[in-house]
Amino acid sequence: MNLRVLYEDNHLISVFKPSRMLVQDDVTGDASLYDQVKYYLKNKYHKPGNVFLGLLHRLDRPVCGTILFARTSKAAARLSEQFRNHSIKKIYHTFVFGHPAKKADTLVHFLTKDHELNITSAQLEDVEGSLRAELSYEVVETFANTSLLKITLKTGRPHQIRSQLSAIGHPIMGDMKYGAPDLLPDQNGIALMATELTFKHPTKEEKITVTADLPANWFEYARNS
């Protein structure tokens, strides 16, 4: 097991989720990050019996980056409240096709999901059954045919970043489900990473920021696309 621990104390643990890995078990029976973290804690601290681990949020399976778990029920309750009231700052970076017309902008869409196809549509009108989605982006760097964007997520809807960027004509590299022309050269997920989480520590009056670096090969793919 090759688990990348980004931050750990007695109350919480943050780890790096690789592309293609599930955060939580599903019907596929594939290995999940949740189970890996429980195994890591059980063995590191020689804990008998079941290990408590609070699942606080998720990332889409093709997405990689920072994931936060609670190690106590008190921490789980307090951190879950921060996720519910949107006080946790979530930063993503992504490589997209094309060059956005604006160097920075806020996008608001209403999302509807086709559960059979597992795809989300983003539209400007509020239709019945849709969920409001908001994000802000900044263009960090441009290449010949692609751009690197920094995304600040205001809401946390499934497939939100993927569908909203596709809706404005800039699909994420490797994300063929949302309009990318092909997979990444390594065929490993999509070029979207949760790079930063900032939250209030559940027992101390301090802010914690957990970060992860973008892989160098994504820059190479962006330059060559």
Give residue spans per PLM region:
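RNA pseudouridine synthases
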Residues: 1-225
